[in-house]
Amino acid sequence: MPVIGMLSLGSATSEFDAAFERGLAERGYVFGKNVTKEARRARGNYDKLAQLAKELVSLNPTLIVASGNVAALAARRATSTVPIVFIIASDPVKIGLAKNLARPGGNATGISMLTATLTLKRLELIRELVPPNATVGLLINPDNKDLLLEIEEIARSTGQSLEVAEARNPDDLEPAFAQLVKAQVSAVLVGNDAGFLAQRAQIVALAKRHSLPATYEFREFPAVGGLMSYGPSVAGALQKAGTYAALILKGAQPSDLPIEQPTAFELVINSTTARSLGIQIPASLLLRANEVIE
């Protein structure tokens, strides 16, 4: 029976696991019936990913599914032969996972979430809620260097003053928010990162504690009390990763499977959080929302 290795930063999440399994099932694969899995999860500790990737490779899996930039790179460094399906935030060509989007080459393919290209839109959204010329804080994982450089370039091109606070692991989050508060930022842009998604409840709680409006990439943040998100569907990306995994199980080569990019994006606003922050969401913004959480 084929084995799928699962490598991720966070803990198990039933919603995300179910999305991946739906993608597999679309192509006729069901865990426990005709395919099995070996999961390795770093539980928020980036330093564990390299060793966990090596562990998975030593089990001779049929393929590896890696969620997040650092996990994908760890898997790629651990093997050049085992097929890899990734879900990442960055340009896979820039970070060395693929030769190009149409024909990746090598042993890795998957889904790129177009994070940096959405930053300008998210900046525009948050600027509708804060005073002109306000400083915006950026919470980012320093391991995502390409993403940081792209966001800083976007900020410069728009004249946006940016205070960068770095957080690599969960213990870094409180000091990062303390830095942003000290810098008197008016709002926070939370960068896309698998660790941030895994720690979303803590990040949302910190933003609330410090009365900071924050915008995020995915609806999973406003679902737990974050103010606003704009971006693609995580569940949709994982479901697509499931279909790619199934194609590889059927004999497709990663080098021939084009890297997918999302084409649909959703604006989600948590109106309860807005009221608690004393923010009046403009009617024009509410009308553009795909979902308003009461």
Regions from the PLM with identified roles:
Residues M1-E294:
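Short hydrophobic alpha-helices and adjacent helix-cap/hinge residues
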